[in-house]
């Protein structure tokens, strides 16, 4: 799993397969991410 930080809301989004689970209109607003177990 990977945590992305939303550059618009500054919220952390947990994702699988390097993609956030919640994608709006297939646009991903994520800057830096880090891996978690």
From Swiss-Prot:
<dbReference type="Pfam" id="PF00838">
    <property type="entry name" value="TCTP"/>
</dbReference>
<dbReference type="GO" id="GO:0005737">
    <property type="term" value="C:cytoplasm"/>
</dbReference>
<keyword id="KW-0963">Cytoplasm</keyword>
<comment type="function">
    <text>Binds calcium; exact function not known.</text>
</comment>
<dbReference type="InterPro" id="IPR018105">
    <property type="entry name" value="Translational_control_tumour_p"/>
</dbReference>
<dbReference type="InterPro" id="IPR011057">
    <property type="entry name" value="Mss4-like_sf"/>
</dbReference>
<dbReference type="InterPro" id="IPR034737">
    <property type="entry name" value="TCTP"/>
</dbReference>
<protein>
    <recommendedName>
        <fullName>Translationally-controlled tumor protein homolog</fullName>
    </recommendedName>
</protein>
<keyword id="KW-0106">Calcium</keyword>
<comment type="subunit">
    <text>Monomer.</text>
</comment>
<feature type="domain" description="TCTP">
    <location>
        <begin position="1"/>
        <end position="37"/>
    </location>
</feature>
<comment type="similarity">
    <text>Belongs to the TCTP family.</text>
</comment>
């Amino acid at each position: 799993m990977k945590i992305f930080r939303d550059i618009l809301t500054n919220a952390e989004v947990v994702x699988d397969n390097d993609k956030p689970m919640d994608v709006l209109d297939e646009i991903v607003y994520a800057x830096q991410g880090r891996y978690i177990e």
